[in-house]
Amino acid sequence: MFLGSLSKMDKLLSFFYHIPPMPTVKKISILEIMRNSQKGRDYVEVDVKKVMEHLNEIYQCGAKPDGTFTRMAYSREDKKGREVFCGYFEKLGIPTRVDQAGNLIARMEGTDPSLPAIMVGSHLDTVPDGGKYDGAVGCMGGLAVCETLIQEGRKLKHPLEVVVFTDEEGFRFGSGLLGSSALCGEELDIHPEDLDIEGKTRREVFEGCGMSVEHVAGAKRDPESIHCFIELHVE
């Protein structure tokens, strides 16, 4: 998916980082991150056991008896997974909202409300028989940061937003990155009468999720409102 959509991904990266599109992205190993974090820096550790518990709970939203699972965008399983994810933030007292593109966004305020938000997240929708951790790890990583900050009684200077992007995989209608593209203000090639793999129109599917095809572009964010975007991604 990334190789086939490199041009669009470059544009998304340029939006979040306020820099021209780059031909390559630097890879940083976990060991390097760990070494840097120990060089006199103030840091806290997340509860890995709790993260795994959350991942297993989300996994059940779409799990099949044969051990595989599917959480297709806009499906009952996708909705359930998002409801479970929202529940974690509700317990923390962190408000959530859904924008016009269906992106689920939780926001933890910082100490300086004038600063742009640090955005962390990924997606929860999957391809058929998808990977257990694909996308979900990025979402849970953002949740873990919020849980840890609250547990430690800390706050960031910047607001922290955890986002679950809508329809990243694009399996249902044949085109992905809808939520992130809408948030970045990309031109969207979507139409009310587009048919999904089950023969349902996009309008029908969107309305079933409380969305409107005509209003998806309203999810566009001002680049100045986002300080940076971080995604923890595997698989």
Give a label for each model feature:
Residues 1-2, 6-14, 20, 26-31:
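Intrinsically disordered, low-complexity segments enriched in serine/proline and basic residues
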Residues 17-18, 38:
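Low-complexity, intrinsically disordered or signal/transmembrane-proximal segments
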Residues 34-75:
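N-terminal capping segment at the start of a domain
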Residues 63-109:
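A non-catalytic alpha/beta surface segment that caps or lines the substrate-entry region
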Residues 88-92, 104-137, 142:
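Catalytic-core environment of secreted peptidases
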Residues 96-100, 120-122, 162-164:
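General beta-strand structural signal in soluble alpha/beta enzymes
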Residues 127, 137-235:
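Acidic/histidine-rich catalytic neighborhood of metal-dependent amide-processing enzymes
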